[in-house]
């Protein structure tokens, strides 16, 4: 009798664990490619999501979603600090392999991210891709502080905000009037060009124009000055005499 009771309890425990495991798998959130494309096209809605392309860097550079940053699955654990502010917000992960995406979702969840969704893979859905690199605020700030490399900054904000403060050596551009953009660009199309605006939308327009003009190393700030208090230099044109 005792043996039968023990067997019944054991079977019940195994069944419970199995059901829990099945429940976890089936409750994993998934996003259709069509929906993710719509989010990327909506300048306001995209602000509510952090989209991470977890393919390797080479695949990312061949083309990726407009507002997606690149963190390969193998590098997620050591890159958490860069995206820690998104722990309580919506995060969407995609790649060219469902297993990579699943692993990335699991890693982010273990690191405390509460709302992680997997999207259809690039093999399952034909996404609209761009070829410029999208940087999160952490990496863009690093670029601002790095004075050793030969890079160019373009500021796509209104002139009044540009005049107040901007990246060292930055040039102000109007995303709605790019006819004369070529005249302020370096001749060497391998030159790294970094762009920013208020929320990444205007600068993404200019970024695409640069790609169309043949520039190879274009970097757009996902987070603009409304979302991140970047450490900019005060514009020389607006500095009070005797204060420098």
Language-model features and meaning:
Residues 2-8, 22-39, 45-49, 56-90, ...:
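Rhodanese-like catalytic fold shared by cysteine-dependent sulfurtransferases
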Residues 10-13:
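Gram-negative bacterial Sec-dependent N-terminal signal peptides
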Residues 16-19:
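Bacterial Sec-type N-terminal signal peptides, specifically the leucine/valine-rich hydrophobic h-region
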